Amino acid sequence: HNYFLPQYFCIKFFFITRIMKIIGTGRSHPSLVVTNEMLSQILDTSDEWITSRTGIKERRIISSENLEDLAIDAAKKALADANMDAKDLDYIICANVVNEYVSPAMSCLIQGAIGAKCPCFDLNGACVGFIYSLEIAEAFYKSGKYKNILIVCAEEPSRMVNWHDRTASVLFGDGAA
């Protein structure tokens, strides 16, 4: 009789954690300032009512600028803050909802303007767009395939907000980061 003894293998798993970090930031906002006092002239509200509920004293609204320019400016500032060149980017993610164009995607406009040669896409995530973008960027980074990922969040809610609704209009401003 041949007896086969089970062989036991000791398998060790080693997990190497790749930690992603933010190495640069940039922001860009329109020049037009809309204060709570200005809103109180068209709404049944006051500076005190808005500030006590939101902490907001003013917001920026696009007038002579456009969202694309703000997004590109924020991207350039983030790259400069990170001491990085656009050619070093491995991916661009742009989180936004309100866009000037259906196509091309805002990320493609940013990519072309800064001279990047990497893949890019837009993510429509509304208020949580940055969080979703960060989670996707982390997954890309941990895959080992992408190292330098630019996330740009650009919004122009002033085009859609009901300026006669004091519960919503007091919350939103335009800009990019």
Question: Where does each model-flagged region fall?
Answer:
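Low-complexity, intrinsically disordered or signal/transmembrane-proximal segments
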Residues: 1-3, 7-8
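Short glycine-rich or small-residue beta-strand-to-loop segments that form or flank ligand, phosphate
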Residues: 90-96
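Conserved beta-strand-centric core segments of catalytic alpha/beta enzyme folds
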Residues: 13-37, 134-177
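Conserved catalytic cysteine-centered active-site region
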Residues: 51-53, 57-68, 96-148
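Conserved "HGTGT" condensation-loop signature of ketosynthase/thiolase-family condensing enzymes
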Residues: 10-90, 114-115
